[in-house]
């Protein structure tokens, strides 16, 4: 009996639970001895990827521990390969007596006739297709290329949609922890949550927070992440913002809905995205109305938000020397924080 090998290619940026469901189902239905996840090379089309080749492989290796007979191949990445024919030929040479199956989604099925070397591929391997919404299984194209129907995938997950959706139930826990430990997807997540003007503000806050952290001998990367994410929830619809604040966080007493984004942003990072770093969570939560007891990171994010370079052009800063306060914050963080806090509080009273 011939050994059966499945090739499952894709960006896996990141790998998620739908990928794992499909892999397990394919192995079972085809009775395959091996399934290889083959991440696409991130080279020519760099803008299409958010995580590096190294990180995507690392996440795959963590994820496949739950899939029997699954392996990760770096062939496409190692050889900078962009053509499926090369991938299939590689596996044919490694397993010359095996049956090769090439796993695709119904979205790719519709493009199959446009693939390079499609007739050769048809002869070298058997295409198997899983159906994913909103792309129905195209029987006409399937018959043309002898594509076997696998099943419908009940999990509607797309890697691109994970940027502004709750991730905790959609991504394997080990992968989620890897993402958060290495602060992956920060930039695309911000871009998915806020408009460009707010995004640029977040980056400036992150960069200034990093500078202040370095000057105060604190974790620069943590400060950048907290600063960049501080306005994560700033542009949520008001009704959603208020609903999360009142229903999930039980906040009932607040001066204006405009301050709720700090609490909701911290909630989203923790409960949607699985961030466990309490210092980052608290710094974001405390950046609008700081409590009496604040950490150094709290002070840094608060200051970076109020003193980032573009604040000079804004009306609120008319009576405050931003450059001088930034300089002071690098040598005496607490003093700079107290001066800025008092100024802002007086401004609000007026």
Curated annotation (Swiss-Prot):
Taxonomic superkingdom: Bacteria
Pathway: Cofactor biosynthesis; NAD(+) biosynthesis; deamido-NAD(+) from nicotinate D-ribonucleotide: step 1/1
UniProt EC number: 2.7.7.18, 3.6.1.41
Residues at which Fe cation binds: 201, 230-231, 305
HD domain boundaries: 198-310
Role noted for this protein: Catalyzes the reversible adenylation of nicotinate mononucleotide (NaMN) to nicotinic acid adenine dinucleotide (NaAD). Hydrolyzes diadenosine 5',5'''-P1,P4-tetraphosphate (Ap4A) to yield ADP.
Family the UniProt entry places it in: In the N-terminal section; belongs to the NadD family.
Protein name: Probable nicotinate-nucleotide adenylyltransferase/Ap4A hydrolase
Source species of the chain: Mycoplasma genitalium (strain ATCC 33530 / DSM 19775 / NCTC 10195 / G37)
